[in-house]
Structure formats: C-alpha cells, structure tokens
Amino acid sequence: MVLISVVGTLITDNLTDNFGISLTTTTIVFAIALSITFIWWYMQEKTLSITSITTTKREAFYWLTILFTFALGTASGDLVAEKFNLGYLTALIIFAGLIALIAITHYVVKGILAVEHKHQSRNAVLAFWLIYILTRPLGASIGDYLSQAQTDGGLGLGTTTTSLIFLGAILVLVIYLTLTKKDEIDSTTI
C-alpha cells in the first residue's frame, strides 16, 4: 500500500512540477481515470465491495483504483490548498468536513434503510469509497499544514518531524487495535 501511495503521489508531482501540467488538469484527468476504473470494475465484476476481492482480477481493479485515488488525492489536495489559494488548514477543514458529512449521511441512510428493511450494502460501499478517496487529500493537507514553513501557511515543523508524528500516530493506532481488537468485525454482521 505504501509503495502504491508513493507512486500515485510521484505521478502527480512529476506531472505538475516537471512537466508543467496544471493541478486543475491533473485533478480532472485522474478523476476521469478513477471513474472509468470504477465503471469498468463494476461492469466486469458487478461489485465494488472490498470484502469481495477474492480473485486476481478483482485485486487488479482494486490496486488500479488505489493508484488513481492517490494520484487524484494529491492533485485535488494541492489544487484546493495552493491553486485556489485557500491554504493548508482550510483544505484540511474542507476535506475533514466532507468525510464527516459522508459518514453522517451513511449512518442516517443506513438507519432509514434498516427501518424500511431494505438492503444497505450499496450505501456502505459508496460511503467507503467516497471517504477513502477523500482521505488522501486530507492526509496531504495535514502533512503540508504541519511541515510547510509558516510563511507558506504551515506550522513549520519540517518534513522529518511531520513524518515522525505520522509514524508515531500509526504505531499507536496499530498497537491499540492489536491489543483491543476493536477493529475486528463480527462475522455475523457481514
């Protein structure tokens, strides 16, 4: 996962920094590429659920989706923060707000569907992918806000300190989930 995230980020950064392709263009192109991947995946497999990735073909679709997600996330995060001149903190708030809105909507719709005894899986799959797509620009906005110089709208912690903060947070989360098992899904709820 880390390698594919780095590749997706580097693709966007190289297109914008070395080839002069605008953030608007890269955002649009990667949004289209991601949409085509989702459509192609669904047409071939009739599902986009990550719980049904049980074949090599589905795994290939998944990793292609992840690659485009990271490329799109980098482009859109930079577009909002830099090109639209909103700054890293505002971009962070926008992406966090969108994630919260989708999560809240998911749980409201889930409740309505449960009352009406309707199938909930499409709502869950859609919510998952929308939130997943938005986590990349959120993470990039947080990283940029922490690492960039204060004159550029950041906190000026630098790349090394920011990386150590992220690494520490990941380690704490992994240790916590390993010890508490709170991330395990009850097989009767699937």
Regions found by a protein language model. Name each.
Residues M1-I190:
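Polytopic alpha-helical membrane proteins, predominantly small-molecule transporters/carriers
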